[in-house]
Design a protein with these regions (language model features):
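Local sequence-structure signature of Cys/Sec-based thiol-disulfide redox active-site neighborhoods
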Residues: 33-48
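Thiol-based oxidoreductase modules, predominantly thioredoxin-like and allied folds used
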Residues: 60-70, 80, 88
């Protein structure tokens, strides 16, 4: 019975294959979209919205500095204002926008300022905790254009 000796070349090929196998899951994993959020340090519903985003595949950095100045800098008209403002993938997010619609926005890439859920409707993400019971008010997610006009991107009833 003859055995062939393990050569240096075989060892290097085996090591390269093992390295590729171990690295493959990390190389193919999709990066979590990064969201920056500006909010009041005392706002509980903003924290709950951030938790909603994180649970739905986003990486979030929060700034407890308020959001009025950032809202204007991102081009989101005041009329669509809410308690927090965010930025993701070059878009502005205003208010309690569901993660589902943020993912859709990033996939569709419309020419727009971003999405807004004005006013803080009960039942929207972050406004859906036990303190609200089972109450769910209808609301619209608006696609805000660069000219300040908006259209319904998704209705929640």
């Amino acid at each position: 019975m003859t055995h062939s000796p393990i050569t240096r070349r075989h060892s290097l090929l085996a090591l390269a294959g093992l390295t590729a196998l171990v690295a493959a899951p990390h190389g193919f994993a999709a990066a979590r979209p990064h969201v920056e959020v500006w909010k009041s340090p005392s706002c509980g519903c903003c924290k709950d919205w951030i938790t909603h985003l994180e649970a739905n595949g986003f990486e979030v950095t929060a700034f407890d500095t308020g959001n009025t100045d950032v809202r204007a800098q991102l081009g989101m008209p005041q009329q669509y204002g809410s308690c927090h403002t965010a930025r993701v993938g070059g878009y502005a997010l205003e208010g309690h926008v569901p993660a589902r619609e943020v993912h859709r926005l990033l996939k569709e890439k419309p020419s727009a300022v971003g999405l807004a859920v004005p006013a803080m409707p009960v039942g929207s993400p972050g406004m859906d905790g036990p303190e609200y019971g089972s109450r769910k008010d209808p609301y619209d997610v608006l696609l805000v254009q660069r000219d300040g006009k908006a259209s319904v991107y998704q209705a929640y009833r």
